[in-house]
């Protein structure tokens, strides 16, 4: 019965089942599962990168944190910190496939420019759209540099490099 109602609901909207909704929900559930099961508490150096500006998690940050703090202790969840603390220590987000300046600014408020990486989402998005959007961003230049390169250098422990003249 559930399958039939699912088919009826999504039959004319099958394009929503993939990247726009289903992928984000699945990744969000896995990431939050890692948090609530104490994975980052047991492995504090573990770093996870979530694409698409955090797969909706930053937009539910207050609600998730509210439930973690008010409900987690009675449920006996393994996590020891708040969702915001895990984002500050273990979770990163990318701009991949999400070239919206207001959305980026919101994510900067929620997780901080120090935890965001510029990314494109190729082959689903093209370099031209991503780079045109990024080059035209009207945000603090220091934050733009962090998102564009400094955060990746830090996360991936990249050595110093020589800027090409091209």
Language-model segments: residues:
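Histidine/acidic-residue-rich catalytic or RNA/ligand-binding cores of hydrolases
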Residues: 7-14, 54-69, 104-109, 125-137
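Aromatic-lined glycan-binding groove of carbohydrate-active enzymes
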Residues: 35-38, 42-86
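Active-site gating loops and adjacent loop-to-helix segments of metal-dependent hydrolytic enzymes
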Residues: 5-25, 67-90
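Active-site glycine- and acidic-residue-rich loops that bind
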Residues: 26-33, 48, 95-101
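Specific transmembrane alpha-helix
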Residues: 20-40
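Short, small-residue-biased leader/transition segments that mark boundaries at the very start
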Residues: 1-2
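Active-site flanking residues adjacent to catalytic metal/cofactor-binding acidic residues
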Residues: 51, 119-120
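Mid-to-C-terminal alpha-helical segments outside catalytic/metal-binding sites
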Residues: 37-38, 46, 79-80, 92-94, ...
């Amino acid at each position: 019965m559930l399958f039939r109602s699912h088919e009826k609901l999504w039959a004319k909207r099958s394009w929503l089942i993939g990247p726009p909704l289903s992928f984000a929900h699945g990744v969000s559930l896995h990431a939050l599962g890692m948090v609530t099961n104490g994975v980052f508490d047991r492995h504090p150096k573990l770093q996870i990168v979530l694409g698409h500006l955090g797969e909706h998690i930053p937009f539910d940050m207050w609600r998730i944190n509210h439930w973690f703090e008010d409900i987690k202790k009675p449920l006996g969840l393994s996590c020891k910190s708040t969702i915001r603390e895990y984002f500050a220590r273990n979770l990163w987000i990318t701009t991949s496939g999400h070239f919206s300046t207001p959305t980026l600014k919101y994510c900067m408020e929620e997780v901080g420019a120090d935890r965001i990486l510029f990314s494109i989402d190729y082959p689903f998005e093209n370099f031209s759209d991503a780079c045109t959007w990024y080059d035209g961003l009207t945000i603090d230049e220091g934050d733009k540099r962090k998102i564009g390169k400094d955060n990746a250098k830090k996360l991936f422990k990249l050595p110093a490099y020589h800027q090409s003249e091209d």
